[in-house]
Design a protein with these regions (language model features):
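N-terminal secretory signal peptides that target proteins for export/translocation
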Residues: 1-7
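General secretory precursor processing signal
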Residues: 7-9, 204
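Beta-rich carbohydrate-recognition and catalytic domains
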Residues: 29-63, 68-115, 122-315, 324-329, ...
Length: 353
């Protein structure tokens, strides 16, 4: 098990050199680090951290990641700014051939918005698509969802275009059968007024409302949608009112009728994927017992998240990107457990059932 902590001074478009060192002294994956359900976790397959490395820390605050593998290259996108919320927020895209040496590909800025929470996908016609949001902290309508496209593998990007409805945050887009789906949550300051809307797009540039108001409890926030092999859909949803337990939504085609249920943990920044064997693994921020970024098995039938691996993390942390590649799960995330809020990359081995 190795954990690499190597960052050299930044040179634009010059690769970062990274050297592996042991994680054993700095990270303990003891049972005390794990928050599980009341089930006997001894029978649960537990992923193993193989390697981790810090890959970027050049801004004062580096956060909110996503990860993509495209044309045999790794793409990681995240926000750079002077603080967690600051008017100078910009979106940095870095690339790597091997996951060790990274170089800056693009920096997307705005004179008007604090740019936040970028997500990367590939459109059906092969373009890179970057979703994010522009924030004006003191405005009546604070958030505007936006999209950018690149036809040259991330070297240049189109001007940002607003999508969805003003004040609704389309947090992540998922492509399914040629259509992009995105949950958008209302960003009222009063969290009890925050509702959820489902959007759909043919091209990623124009999102139409598919369901105006879903029946998810008020106070909803960040989400991720998973389309399963049987064509059913799941939505893992952050919930920030009442007991603050995460929500799980389920739907069948055409995805207009969603059923919601409480899960057993409070979460933030959710992402998830389905393994080839059908199991579902989620990456989230967990709160009980200390804030951290962790992997959990999602049990949709019983409505449970079962934590199985705490990543080296703490403090200001979460917002993971997930890619399954050559038998390992690659995870980008951000954390401040080493002091400065920085971008990390972990590789995890997932045991078979």
């Amino acid at each position: 098990m190795k954990f690499c902590r190597c960052v050299r001074p930044f040179l634009t478009a010059v690769a970062l050199s990274l050297v592996a060192i042991s994680i054993a002294d700095s990270t303990s994956l003891s049972a005390a680090d794990s928050e599980t359900s009341s089930d006997d976790s001894s029978a649960i397959s537990k992923p193993v951290l193989v390697e981790g490395r810090r890959i970027w820390d050049q801004a004062k605050h580096n956060a909110f990641t996503d990860l993509l593998r495209h044309k045999n290259r790794w793409y990681c996108v995240f926000r750079e700014g002077s603080a967690h919320v600051s008017p100078d927020g910009a979106l940095r895209v870095i690339v790597s051939d091997d996951g060790e040496k990274w170089e800056s590909k693009a920096l997307i800025t705005s004179p008007k918005y604090d740019l936040r929470d970028a997500k990367l996908t590939v459109t059906p016609d092969g373009r890179l698509m970057l979703n994010g949001a522009g924030m004006i902290a003191d405005a009546k309508i604070r958030y505007y969802s936006m999209v950018w496209f690149s036809s040259d593998d991330g070297q240049t990007w189109t001007e940002g275009k607003q999508i969805g409805d003003p004040g609704f945050w389309l947090w992540r887009s998922q492509w399914h059968k040629g259509m992009a789906y995105s949950m958008g949550y209302a960003t009222y300051r009063d969290r009890t007024q925050r509702t959820l809307r489902l959007y759909r797009s043919k091209d990623g540039g124009t999102f139409d409302t598919l369901v105006d108001q879903l029946s998810a409890p008020a106070g909803c926030g960040e989400d991720t949608i998973l389309f399963r092999k049987d064509q059913s859909a799941l939505c893992l949803l952050r919930h920030e009112t009442g007991d603050k337990m995460a929500q799980l939504g389920t739907a069948l085609p055409p995805y207009t009728d969603w059923k919601w249920r409480d899960l057993n943990l409070r979460i933030g920044g959710p992402n998830m994927l389905q393994l080839p064997d059908g199991r579902i693994l989620a990456a989230t921020r967990l709160y009980a017992g200390g804030v951290r970024t962790s992997l959990s098995w999602l049990d949709p039938k019983n409505g449970k998240l079962i934590e199985v691996l705490k990543l080296p993390s703490g403090g200001d942390t979460s917002y993971a990107g997930l890619v399954l590649h050559e038998g390992l799960l690659w995870i980008s995330y951000y954390s401040s457990h080493e002091g400065k809020t920085s971008i990390y990359l972990a590789k995890v081995r997932i045991p078979s059932q």
